[in-house]
């Protein structure tokens, strides 16, 4: 729930009511609700439940992380300026800057706000892929190529935070030796040894 206009107060209040309603609706199935941060942008009077609610903190102008923590929300750090992939769009990232993320970023960095490491209300981080431009030639394989190095890098950062002891250059070389999983080869790797990958036979009648 985000990116609604806040120009009209009645719309803001309905948006907040909508958000609160569906938080409770999801919880009615025994699940934890997760919302996209918008309650700074949609500031109003209608209360929105915060206890045991996860909020994806993606843009501080929409949800000020300090204020959201004060209100009681648990945050997932997904700042758009670092962790948004929009394939072949010309804005955000086509591929994440994994070196910068590995060396400098942790979930405690939400936009320009930096919180203490292992803050009890910051539950982790994630990246996002948004396929804004359908039909631009990007296939599911292309998305895989963009996602896999991001996944490897963020897996390390979720585990170690700021305490990455292995130099990035060593990590980056080592990650290339890891397979996607037993028997999985979505990337279509063929190895370093030259070999035929396609043979065409001509049959004579």
Placement of each model-derived feature along the sequence:
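A glycine-rich phosphate-binding loop feature that marks nucleotide/adenosyl-phosphate handling sites
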Residues: 38-45, 82-85, 171-173
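C-terminal functional modules
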Residues: 117-205
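Aromatic-lined glycan-binding groove of carbohydrate-active enzymes
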Residues: 63-129
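Active-site neighborhood of glycoside hydrolase catalytic domains
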Residues: 1-54, 58-72
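Short flexible/disordered coil segments
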Residues: 35, 39-60, 92-116, 186-204
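Tryptophan-centered motif/residue detector
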Residues: 36, 56-58, 84, 130-135, ...
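Histidine/acidic-residue-rich catalytic or RNA/ligand-binding cores of hydrolases
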Residues: 46-47, 86-94, 136-140
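Structural recognition of the beta-strand scaffold that forms the well-ordered cores
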Residues: 33-36, 54-57, 75-78, 124-128, ...
């Amino acid at each position: 729930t985000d990116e609604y206009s806040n120009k009209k107060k009645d719309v803001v209040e309905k948006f907040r009511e909508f958000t609160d309603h569906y938080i409770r609706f999801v919880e009615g199935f025994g699940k934890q609700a997760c919302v996209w941060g918008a309650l700074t942008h949609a500031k109003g009077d209608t209360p929105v439940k915060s206890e045991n609610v996860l909020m994806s903190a993606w843009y501080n102008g929409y949800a000020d992380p300090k204020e959201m923590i004060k209100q009681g929300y648990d945050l997932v750090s997904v700042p758009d300026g670092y962790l948004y992939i929009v394939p072949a769009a010309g804005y955000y990232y086509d591929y994440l800057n994994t070196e910068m993320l590995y060396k400098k970023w942790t979930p405690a960095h939400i936009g320009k706000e930096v919180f203490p490491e292992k803050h009890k209300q910051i539950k982790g981080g994630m990246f996002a892929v948004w396929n804004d431009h359908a039909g631009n030639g990007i296939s599911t394989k292309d998305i895989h190529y963009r996602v896999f190095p991001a996944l490897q890098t963020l897996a390390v950062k979720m585990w170690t935070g700021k305490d990455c002891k292995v130099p990035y250059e060593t990590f980056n070389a080592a990650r290339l030796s890891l397979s996607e999983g037993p028997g999985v080869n979505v990337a279509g790797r063929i190895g370093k040894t030259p070999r035929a990958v396609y043979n065409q036979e001509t049959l004579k009648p």
